Regions:
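Regulatory sensory and allosteric helical modules in signal-transduction proteins
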Residues: 103-147, 167
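Short glycine-/small-residue motifs
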Residues: 162-165
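Regulatory loop-to-helix N-cap segments in sensory/regulatory domains
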Residues: 157, 169-177
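Short, positively charged
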Residues: 1-10
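Signal-transmission linkers at sensory-effector interfaces
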Residues: 14-60
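A short, aliphatic-rich beta-strand micro-motif
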Residues: 144-157
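Helix-loop-beta substructure at the N-terminus of cytosolic sensory domains
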Residues: 63-102
Length: 177
């Protein structure tokens, strides 16, 4: 009885048997699953590449002998390994020997309060945030998109005040969107 049932095909006005329709539905389902598997493999490859870069970056940071050189190592590692065109870091409330270092200069009380108010990294357009001014402009192009990462002890969403801010920028308005 079921072999004689005819159903209209979604790919035309012709009638097809129930078995043909079920086989067609299974082919479509398999095709969808294949796409999902390809996406998972692609994501896995991306994750492996990111893990390798993070490992290279942290290894380079561990090789820094002088704490004075650490902020520059953080910034240069991010720019080179992660292809971030613009990056800067500022820290405040530092020990005496570091008080005049470049990485401790230029953070106003407003910028410090703003960094402390961030309970998660900000990613989006450059809306004229003061920390965007800390970035060196590559080829005269100002940052159109930013990632602002507060530096604090403990979890990023803790009530602990930030002791610094890592700023990533790009002339591409969608890079950190």
């Amino acid at each position: 009885v079921l072999a004689s049932v005819q159903i209209t095909s979604p790919h035309g006005q012709r009638a097809v048997s129930l078995q043909e329709r079920q086989a067609e539905m299974l082919r479509e389902k398999i095709k969808g699953l294949e796409h999902r598997i390809m996406d998972m493999v692609r994501n896995s490859n991306d994750n492996t590449a990111i893990a390798t870069k993070v490992h290279q970056w942290t290894s380079a940071l561990l090789r820094v002998k002088d704490p004075f050189d650490l902020p520059e190592a953080v910034v240069s590692g991010i720019r080179t390994l992660f292809d971030v065109p613009q990056a800067a870091v500022r820290v405040w409330t530092v020990a005496g020997p570091y008080i005049d270092a470049d990485f401790t200069q230029g953070a106003s009380e407003d910028a410090r309060a703003f960094a402390s108010s961030l309970t998660m990294p900000f990613c989006g357009p450059n809306l004229g945030f003061e920390p965007a001014g800390w970035l060196a402009q590559e080829a005269g192009e100002p940052a159109q998109s930013l990632a602002l990462l507060p530096l604090r002890e403990g979890a990023i969403d803790s009530a602990t005040p930030a002791f610094g801010l890592l700023v990533l920028g790009s002339p591409d308005p969608l890079r950190f969107d």
